[in-house]
Amino acid sequence: MSRTMQSKRMQNSVAGMPNHSLFLLLPHTRMQFAVFCLLALGNFAYADNIHHVINKLPYDKIKPFPPVQPDCQINEIALQFQPQLHISSGCHPYPAVDAKGYISNGLGVSHTFTDCDGSPEGSQVYGRAYVFKGYLAIMYAWYFPRDYMVTPVWVGHRNAWEHAVLWINDMDDDPKLLAVAAKSMVGYKTYSPPKSKYMDDDSFKLKYKWMVVSHHYLAATKDKGEFQDLIMWDNMTENARISTGPQGWSHYQSPLGDDRFFRALHESYPF
């Protein structure tokens, strides 16, 4: 994938809010990318502090955002390294929020025979990027209308999020994936460097799995998975960003809102 844009590597400590002095250096030959995702480096650090009424829709009625285009450097890299997700049990990922800010109401565990093998509206994976301590961190997050396991007893709950943070050397001409930190049962499981058996070209392969009576979590796998339509945080509408903050989904909140996102970067930092 050809890139001529250069980034200015920034060292920052990120105590919880973005450093708005971060920027990309754009050569004249790539000025068409002047939209350079102010987003990922400015990162709209207000979503957690805004309160509004959040409406809910049935889990299979949320319309996903159109997939992001490689129209700026951040989006280009996020698409290049988008991980695959292998599903062998439980629900498939569904859209969590629509352009108006309506969120999924999820699916109760008591709905034993209700299908959750994929939304008729299409699927979605959510991304958010930030330059942290000189490395480009990209979070990929999936929403599941419920998390359940068929064991001697029926275990689970309505609404679930899983995520992984990919750590990339920099936004230079030849970005390289250095580490993957997948949210596990306890903390993060780090794959640094990622082994070739877990890679499919530039895509890291993740599995949505469970163990005994645990909740589902993410782990590396040799099995190929599927791609979902990627939407980046900064390409979402303002209403959607606010709705994915701490007000949505009660105890099973999205990892994309400011507080949880920056906490995840600190906890998953692998170097």
From Swiss-Prot:
Induction: Highly expressed at multiple time points in both early and late stages almost the entire host infection process. Keywords: Glycoprotein, Secreted, Signal, Virulence. Pfam families: NPP1. Its main location: secreted. It is found in: Secreted. A motif (Conserved heptapeptide motif) lies at residues 156-162. The keyword Secreted applies. A motif (Conserved undecapeptide motif) lies at residues 137-147. One of its GO terms (cellular component) is extracellular region. Coiled coil: none annotated. Residues 1-47 form the signal peptide. Glycans are attached at residue 235. InterPro entries: NPP1. Belongs to the Necrosis inducing protein (NPP1) family. Secreted effector that acts as a pathogen-associated molecular pattern (PAMP) recognized by the plant immune system. Seems not to induce necrosis in Nicotiana benthamiana leaves but significantly improves disease resistance of Arabidopsis thaliana to Hyaloperonospora arabidopsidis and causes an inhibition of plant growth which is typically associated with enhanced immunity when over-expressed in Arabidopsis. The structure of NLP effectors is remarkably conserved with a high level of conservation of a central region containing the conserved undecapeptide motif AIMYAWYFPKD and heptapeptide motif GHRHDWE. This is NLP effector protein 4. The lineage of its organism: Eukaryota, Sar, Stramenopiles, Oomycota, Peronosporales. The gene is NLP4.
